[in-house]
Amino acid sequence: MEESETKGRISQETDKACVSVERIGSTLLSSFVKKGKEVSNKRNSKQNKRKAEEELCSKSRTKKYSRGWVRCEEMEEEKVKKTRKRKSKRQQKDNKVEVDDSLRLQRRTRYLLIKMKMQQNLIDAYATEGWKGQSREKIRPDKELERARKEILNCKLGLRDAIRQLDLLSSVGSMEEKVIASDGSIHHDHIFCAECNSREAFPDNDIILCDGTCNRAFHQKCLDPPLETESIPPGDQGWFCKFCDCKIEIIDTMNAQIGTHFPVDSNWQDIFNEEASLPIGSEATVNNEADWPSDDSKDDDYDPEMRENGGGNSSNVSGDGGGDNDEESISTSLSLSSDGVALSTGSWEGHRLSNMVEQCETSNEETVCGPRQRRTVDYTQLYYEMFGKDAVLQEQGSEDEDWGPNDRRKRKRESDAGSTLVTMCESSKKDQDVVETLEQSERDSVSVENKGGRRRMFRLPRNAVEKLRQVFAETELPSKAVRDRLAKELSLDPEKVNKWFKNTRYMALRNRKTESVKQPGDSKTVSGGDSGPEAVMENNTETNEVQDTLDDTVPPGFDATNQNILSPCNNNQEEFQQENVSFPSPTDESQQYLEQNDSSFVLVPHEKQSSEISLKTAVEENETESKMMKEPHEELSSEMSLKTAAEEKETESKMIEEPHEELSREMSLKTAVEEKETESKMMEEPHDELNSEMSLSTAVEEKETGSKMTEESHEELSNEMSLEEKETGRKMTEEEELEAVMEMLCRTENKLLDVTQRLDRFKTPKGRKKLGNSSSPLLEEDSVVYVPIAEIKEKR
């Protein structure tokens, strides 16, 4: 008997194993079958299209001349579309692959955990008290919170059910617990494969036991996918089947997200045992906050389970949630009683409603139910009582176009001024001085408003500016103690002193930049509109040096700092701004040379003054102050002094730039001197009126004598000056070469920095877009960038 029973069990297990093998084979071949079906479906669809088109063409030929040709064609097209839809649906059904049970349950548990987290966040949002207990008075939707708790409970039960299904799936083909010893060992005669139920083991197809709770064994090739011998975990490391692995992963995620502490080898009955033991409909007892009263009086209006229960009016007849239903029943009963319809309720509420109807009929003064009765309110009368009838006249309405921040300030000032004037007139009319001051303040405010609401410009006194310039000449960045001391001495605000130093530094830097951009041969010029303190200070210091050099050549009535320049285009006498001449102090050799070359000063007629002024534009830009001179001989003398200063600067620049070509330059100067002498002789005749004045005649005689002296001593001075100039020129050239090398190195360093920044930006796609939109000088050059490599060699 026992042998027959064991044979029957073995036959049943073999049948189950065959069924499972067929399923596994179907899943393995499903992918290949799917691809083959897709290819065949594509071919069949093309063939079907061709057949349908041929049929349509043949039928259209036969029915071309019939009346119902169009209708037949439409009917045929609809039939073809329907057949295509049916075929596509069949193909979709056939192509559907059965999802593995372990993957399906794993997705299900992931969805349930996300849902639990969302509902728990809703509960936590209303559970906290907030900062200083402000959330205590928050309106709490109790129905929504109760629904969230029910959803969490349902999710927990769903997780329990998923683990139960995994245990059932893993129990198929498992070994009995009797066979397993207390230490977990199993005899080899009792081990069989859960898929094929065979006990045989081969070297390349060995039987492997699952270390989970399923108590199953598998051949290596019976698994899906088959397990290779190399991938078998060595030593004490465990191997798990797909169902046990899925169960372990689900329990681990539950413990991590929800905060539970279930062991990995726990049974499905141990998971959420308390929630499963609760009776149906008592989910609210799990909630710790169910006894809290609702802060909202109308919180019971919304019941999220109304749709599920089909309205739920019958369940809310008695209790707090049936307030609205009671009111509706009362209103309907009142309407029915007024129309003469009898109410047959038979309950206690029906008697109460009938009593209320009788009370309404007997006394009209008392309102028992229904909407609140409010008497009509005359809002115009209420407004007059609160603000008075004259409130509209006192208010001055303004249009939207007149509104603005300046207008608001203006109205405020006008109202303040008007109120102060009224109070002063009412109190006493004797204080006329106070009224005048108020009027003056109003005028000032109006003038400020007309100018755009700007503040009055503050100017420092002259003595303070001079003192600050002296300190700035010593140090451009004085310390805080020095600035505070200056502010105390000059009785100024320390902030204004700091601002003055900041502005002067800015102006000095700007002037240095403009001078560095210009050519070295050109004169250092500053526009007449720049009235910075640094520029004025430099010009004042340089005019003192020029005055010392020009004392011997200029007549006694001439002033180098104050001179008048008349434009040749305008005949009208106009006043120009005073301009200070700024030149570098010449050397002793150039001074002697210029004193002997006095013949370079030439009397120029009024018709050629425009040419002289065009040559001297660079000099006139540096001048900042000028006055109108009444006498014409002073005008000519000022022009001559400017010319000498310009020539001094030109000679000095040429001496610095070209020291080796000094002899050729001196010969050119000699020829220029001779030409100027001839011009001076030619120009003496048209200037009879001007030569009558003593100052000009003496100047011409001195120039003629100076020209004769220069011709004789020119050769001697040239030799002496050439030697000295060569020495100075060598020093200057060495310094210039060093400066040029430093400048070149600085430029290369800047280019290297720019290239590295661009390369760093080019690594990211955002940086490429920015480089495409940016405008820089490197974009105009070639796209190839040459990066120099610096190599440092040690001196041997």
UniProtKB/Swiss-Prot annotation:
Comp. bias intervals (Low complexity): 570-580
GO BP: any one term: response to auxin
Basic residues bias spans: 81-90
Designated name of the protein: Pathogenesis-related homeodomain protein
Organism: Arabidopsis thaliana
InterPro entries: HD, Homeodomain-like_sf, PRHA-like_PHD-finger, Zinc_finger_PHD-type_CS, Znf_FYVE_PHD, Znf_PHD, Znf_PHD-finger, Znf_RING/FYVE/PHD
GO MF annotations, alphabetized: DNA-binding transcription factor activity; sequence-specific DNA binding; zinc ion binding
Zn finger (PHD-type) start-end: 190-247
UniProt GO cellular component terms: nucleus
Residue ranges, compositional bias (Basic and acidic residues): 624-636, 645-690, 700-733
